[in-house]
Amino acid sequence: MNDMCSARSGRLGMVLTDIIKSYWSLALFLVWMAVGVFPLSCYENDSMHLLAGCSVMANQGVTVPPPYSYFYDMQPLVSYVVVGLNAVFAWLTCEQLYCLVTWFAACFAVVGTVRFCRRLTLLPVHVLVFALLFLPESYACAMYPNSAVPAYACFVWAMCMVLDGRFVLAVALMGLAPLFRIDVVIVYPVLLPLLLFVYGRKKVWRCVALSAVAAVAVVAMVTVGCAAMGADPVRHTLGMYSSFDVGGQYSGQVKYALFTFYTIVSVVVLPLGVVVLWRRRSLLLLVTCLLPMLLLHYMFRRTGCAGKHWLYILPFVLMLCSTGWAAIAHWCNGRRGARYAVAALVVLYAFCSVRITIPPAVAKVSKAWVGNERQEGPFLTLFSEDLTPMKCRFGIGAGQFIPTADEMMIASGNVFYPFYIHAYKSNKDAMRREAKAYADTLPCYDIAALAWGDRIWYQNLLLDDGYAMTGKNDDGYVLRKGGSTVDCYYVHDDIPKGDAAAAYRTLKPLKRPGRPLLVVPETDARAYVMDKLVALGKAVRHARRCYEVR
């Protein structure tokens, strides 16, 4: 009996040892990623609008659809998940819960991505995790609440279930993912080549039939789910994407999103992975990788303005990049000089950075605010120059800020990215709480929103305090709690960025006798305008992001 127990203990110890050896790098990656998750604060203004609807339902009762949201038809399920969790964990705000949901989903997504890619490439876990470091969206997506992450987590685990032969569970997850975010279906055609991995190329028609069954089942689940939640993604979401595609208002930002998704390192390594798979005649794996990538690139060619839009192709990009890295490592064997050169380049990119200052003379007056509070995070300057207007600095730490439509990304120094985001979120959250500390001294006041982000960024703190939203229309809404009322006005005028005179002409008529008119700008651009009004004596600044119009 003792010998049997000893044998079992020995086998358990061997299993645990193998798990630790295989997955220590993945565990370290998840812990490192968690630094940027905190504080549990949203820095992206679109998600702030969705959160406002969650808070309104938490305070005033659940409705279908929510009384306030952001592109609800595209992402209906996430609102009710957050509100449901708030009913259970009432001591947490909807904003904190949405951050936690995104973080947990990102952790599951990373684990699923590594599991999926390891199954198809047979590469060690540490190689896959190393390649993830140079695909920043794999961890950046965890650091601000967004619906793409739970949708992606469901999708990647559905693909894992396909490889495991658990077809029913895979289809269930594929039906759940679009309810979190509908655009995940763009990459669903990858199911067919994955089924060929499972059943073999001799059973093509069986794979085609299973793909058709999955498609019908997914359409049925999404139709029923959206109908139950009062969402219509076909009519509203497809029309939205079509208008964005035709209008091209986001097309100029696509290149920044792609640069931050792939990074300059992966752009070099990924083609190498394609060549390696081609030479190995791993054509099915190559098709599996390239098919969803081509589909998503085509669909988002003018609208993929943030890294999260490209998140769904992460496992396929990772397989190509990790294959390229493995080929580089193999080539460096026995070549000491090459090994040191590659290691030096990797360390330089991952740990070192160049930062530049963008002065008004270079950025023009419309972008004079660029580079102030976005140069956050740890940065140790090793040397700098003052001879050029850019005032370049080279050092160790988070690199130059790269603007995307939704996310705060950096050009290099990715090892420090979680610390960069932690510092940025802490500072931004502190600014709106400073504004609230002053506004709480006023019984009643008005707020004017000069930009999209200003409409709800600060006001979410009031909703967290139990304020009720009433009278919402195209011009604003009213927040009430007891005897306190806050009237929120939307400014529809297209005020040129940096034009303080135009801003004041718009704000002045909104000021009512006996009621302070506050502006709490979420964006650097509007804060810059308000600072100019302070200098002109037409506004008073009570906190870093709290201004009162005179």
PLM feature spans:
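Membrane-proximal lumenal/periplasmic loop motifs of glycosylation machinery
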Residues: 37-48, 60-83, 95-96, 257-260
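Short acidic/glycine- and proline-prone juxtamembrane loop motifs at membrane-interface regions
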Residues: 44, 140-148, 306
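Hydrophobic, aromatic-rich transmembrane alpha-helices
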Residues: 110-114, 197, 262-294, 324
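Specific aromatic-rich, kink-prone transmembrane helix
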Residues: 112, 150-174, 316-323
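Membrane-embedded, lumen/periplasm-facing catalytic core of multi-pass transferases
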Residues: 117, 348-478
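Membrane-interface alpha helices of multi-pass inner-membrane proteins
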Residues: 129, 156-157, 161, 168-182, ...
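Hydrophobic/aromatic-rich transmembrane helices and adjacent perimembrane loops
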Residues: 186, 290, 302-332
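Membrane-lumen/periplasm interface segments of specific transmembrane helices
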Residues: 206-250, 256-271, 295-297, 352-367
